[in-house]
Amino acid sequence: MGSGEPNPAGKKKKYLKAALYVGDLDPDVTEDMLYKKFRPAGPLRFTRICRDPVTRSPLGYGYVNFRFPADAEWALNTMNFDLINGKPFRLMWSQPDDRLRKSGVGNIFIKNLDKSIDNRALFYLFSAFGNILSCKVVCDDNGSKGYAYVHFDSLAAANRAIWHMNGVRLNNRQVYVGRFKFPEERAAEVRTRDRATFTNVFVKNIGDDIDDEKLKELFCEYGPTESVKVIRDASGKSKGFGFVRYETHEAAQKAVLDLHGKSIDGKVLYVGRAQKKIERLAELRRRFERLRLKEKSRPPGVPIYIKNLDETINDEKLKEEFSSFGSISRAKVMMEVGQGKGFGVVCFSSFEEATKAVDEMNGRIVGSKPLHVTLGQARRRC
């Protein structure tokens, strides 16, 4: 790999610094272990393990700063995917200017990968097409999830990879290789496509007495339905919303146009196209961005608000319920005379974590009640 630092136009310039990013680190790896691993490559200025600002737990990546760029380049070319604590790490040039990464230029997406293809194999498969800034197979506790990202230093290299690799069979699986798209772009494509073809209708603000049959009676006059379902909690009580799937797009569109805003038993219905998860996440992201722009400075935490909490839920239990979604700086149940008031707040370190928590936990039964979870307005203190 060359020693030039790429820019979005695909041109190279000398790296001004000799720093490497080290990813996929075992949680027990320390700065001293990094130093001992990379010192044979050349004199070092320092090593650093990045940690959560609140919990101080390691984030799984760090940096190695060499004195000389040539030594950093040698380490990058010869030590990538070596082991520390029995786990292979990923190396790439540290990029203080993140405009290239945020632009998406040169970034490609690969899916339908065989589980045997790891980061090392991915790197060597695609390095023939140009200089790779980073590559990563997305994994969970069970291993590869079957998709990955490769970021080249130029659009030309990315296009070469797409041209040569899209549709190729790797380990008897035909892979898809295409341009990386940000969630907002993918959501816009889904909206455009689904608005012209949707058959699934989302209905909310329906009365407790509305069951599947009554909902079907209300919607069947617009066309034949494939399924009608009122969503209920574990006790069988209606959650106030449901779905109607029609056989044709025309019937679904007519129902939306005619029934949206109509009053049924004193309740004004919301009737619209059922959105896919990617669209809901994109909408939450747009809403957050609008709120964030109103703030004078970027907040240190992203809050979500939880209503309808069971009386048995305290601060510790609230944090436990949401901890799987990311790093929590604060979890608080509002109290009155020693008893919970039925609502609380949880603050995450990033918007992505908060959004995931809202999407997964809204409507989930905790204790004996379904939670109502919403994204809060970012504040200076969370």
From Swiss-Prot:
Residue ranges constituting the RRM domain according to the UniProt record: 18-96, 106-182, 199-276, 302-378
Cross-referenced InterPro entries: Nucleotide-bd_a/b_plait_sf, PABP_1234, PABP_RRM1, RBD_domain_sf, RRM2_I_PABPs, RRM_dom, RRM_dom_euk
Main location, first listed in the record: cytoplasm
Subcellular location: Cytoplasm
The entry's keywords: Cytoplasm, Mitochondrion, Repeat, RNA-binding
CDD domains, per database record: RRM1_I_PABPs, RRM2_I_PABPs, RRM3_I_PABPs
GO cellular component, one term: nucleus
Tissue: Expressed in fetal brain and in a range of adult tissues.
PROSITE patterns named among the record's database cross-references: RRM
Superkingdom, natural source: Eukaryota
GO MF: mRNA 3'-UTR binding; poly(A) binding; poly(U) RNA binding
Function of the molecule: Binds the poly(A) tail of mRNA. May be involved in cytoplasmic regulatory processes of mRNA metabolism. Can probably bind to cytoplasmic RNA sequences other than poly(A) in vivo.
PANTHER family: RNA BINDING PROTEIN (PTHR24012)
Annotated protein name in UniProt: Polyadenylate-binding protein 5
Source organism of this protein record: Homo sapiens
Gene field: PABPC5
